[in-house]
């Protein structure tokens, strides 16, 4: 069969690459074409557009790059129409992907599958109408989404488990190369996130550099030039007398997390990855006009937490410092409490065990691939 996949950011590229691998195992004749990233391409998909050209967030960045985004969307629509796949598989990234779903349903008879459901339980709940109209099958990776979609909106979905469980379980760490214990800094995957978060993370962690090595996770596709000016500025300002206080780690976050004593993490999939590696963390996310962003969050978001760790647990397991709550002094205070010997460390580790139980066993990409093929072939679904 011919599969057309669309992923709009680094985490979607990772999850989609594992789904492609699982589909290839079950469909020897599978051919893949995608808008995505390097990992999808490495699995054999023909990459016709990279997510780097579409990964903008926030009102102003999106408006400033609206022409680019619209051009990429038009190219994607034309490519689907020309290639005529057997199925279009959308991976997260709802602002772009739901528009693609509308186009596919309006202009073709190609089925639309959605892997990693849009997070409409957080905001833009009205999108359920578009999902109901334009998405044939929805594959969820978060256990609490079943009650939201099926219980509240009477829209049937497939919970297949969480692929992050598989990815962490499959990782084999390399030998540590650092002389001191590590504090991992994960400032995000987009340029705007990195520029907003990294400086504040480094300032918060500065008092610990004599006992810990600070290692920044370099997001896939982001060059050194995004990070090094910030790192060098902070080195001069906050720890000029410490030899090599900050390192930049490329090649993914898993090796870094497997050796970290604690972490500062932006929201998103990275918070779940950090929890599954059993690394205590502080979730911190800077926004411009912080007090206004905090007010907007309270008015718009329909959820009590922003991190997947807390949402899966149904309670606060990790602290969340967002918008005007993310100050270096607050981050520093929480970081101190989760380092070895800190009073909050064991409570987080206990909470992580609860999160792992709720997510379930490995096998999410394989279960999703098997379900997709059964649906496409018209075979009866296995219970």
Which residue ranges define each predicted feature?
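Nucleotide-activated sugar donor-binding and catalytic core shared by glycosyltransferases
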Residues: 1-383
């Amino acid at each position: 069969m011919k599969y057309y996949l669309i992923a709009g950011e680094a985490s979607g590229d990772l999850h989609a690459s594992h789904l492609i691998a699982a589909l290839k195992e079950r469909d020897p004749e599978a051919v893949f074409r995608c808008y995505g990233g390097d990992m999808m391409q490495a699995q054999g998909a023909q990459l016709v557009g990279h997510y780097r050209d579409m990964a903008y967030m926030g009102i102003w960045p999106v408006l400033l790059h609206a022409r680019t985004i619209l051009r990429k969307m038009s190219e994607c629509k034309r490519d689907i129409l020309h290639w005529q796949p057997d199925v279009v598989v959308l991976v997260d990234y709802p602002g772009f992907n739901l528009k693609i779903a509308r186009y596919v349903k309006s202009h073709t008879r190609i089925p639309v599958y959605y892997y990693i459901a849009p997070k409409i339980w957080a905001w833009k709940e009205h999108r359920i109408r578009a999902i109901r109209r334009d998405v044939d099958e929805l594959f969820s990776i978060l256990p609490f989404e079943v009650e939201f979609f099926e219980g509240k909106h009477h829209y049937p979905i497939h919970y297949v488990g969480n692929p992050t469980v598989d990815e962490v379980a499959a990782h084999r760490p390399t030998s540590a190369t650092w002389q001191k214990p590590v504090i991992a800094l994960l400032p995000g995957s987009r340029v705007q996130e990195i520029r907003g978060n990294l400086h504040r993370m480094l300032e918060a962690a500065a008092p610990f550099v004599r006992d810990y090595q600070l290692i920044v996770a370099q997001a896939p596709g982001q060059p050194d030039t995004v990070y090094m000016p910030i790192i060098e500025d902070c080195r001069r300002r906050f720890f000029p007398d410490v030899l090599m206080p900050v390192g930049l780690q490329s090649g993914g976050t898993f090796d870094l997390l497997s050796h970290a004593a604690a972490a500062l993490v932006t929201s998103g999939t990275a918070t779940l990855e950090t929890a599954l590696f059993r690394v205590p963390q502080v979730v911190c996310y800077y926004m411009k006009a912080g007090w206004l962003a905090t007010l907007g969050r309270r008015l718009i978001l329909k959820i009590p937490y922003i991190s997947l760790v807390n949402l899966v647990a149904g309670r606060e397991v990790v602290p969340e410092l967002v918008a005007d709550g993310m100050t270096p002094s607050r981050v520093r205070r929480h970081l101190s409490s989760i380092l070895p010997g800190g009073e909050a460390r064991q409570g987080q580790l206990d909470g992580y065990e609860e999160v792992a139980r709720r997510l379930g066993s490995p096998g999410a990409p394989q279960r999703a691939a098997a379900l997709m093929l059964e649906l496409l072939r018209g075979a009866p679904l296995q219970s």
